[in-house]
Amino acid sequence: MAGLVSLWIAIASPINALDDYLLAAHMIQHFILMSIAPPLIVLGAPTVPLLRGIPRWFRVVLRPFFRARWLHRVVRFFLHPLTAWLLMNIAYLGWHVPAAFELTFRSEAIHQFEHACFFLTSVAFWWVVLAPWPARRVWPRWAVIPYLLSADVLNTVLSAILAFSGRVIYPSYLHAERISTLTPLQDQIAAGAEMWVLNSIVFLVPAVVLTLKMLSPRSLQGLSPSLKAN
């Protein structure tokens, strides 16, 4: 439920109305679509109970579809850690390129497609991190740490560009109606700071928690002597 509520906040609350006027509000929207709603939805994904709750006759109808090898291959491809990492970061960086970003102001359909790209690729990204039951990890658990840290590096680069460029990168915000006391450049600096701090928290906190868990005595007991020495 929390995931659906956060998704509603991103696309149907006043934040959605402000994104044409304030880049800072727009980046909050992107943050919710990529870093709040997806992990919450993955954590609450009732996959098995939902399937078991389907009427028996309907399960019989769906069984050939869910057992299709091509479907399993497609799901495995998109939920593979490397694929999920690349898709999420390509969407994140690609849509923030000025030429692509400006297209979202010219077409509502493109704007919604951008949001769909952010959300769906982020669901795959966080699925790898959280691995909700009955999912099985493709990579060892420790690999989640560089998986998250490398994503944070790219986030830091993009955030720093917005915060320290010294000029307004997205022309549409130069001409947007001013609904706050912030100048367009100040608005962009605030947006970059938001992205930097909020996304870094979301990436770094689970990486640190996982690191501490793996370094705990209980976890170390399960390692071979050679790994402990390293």
Residue ranges and their predicted role:
Residues 1-230:
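Alpha-helical membrane segments of multi-pass proteins
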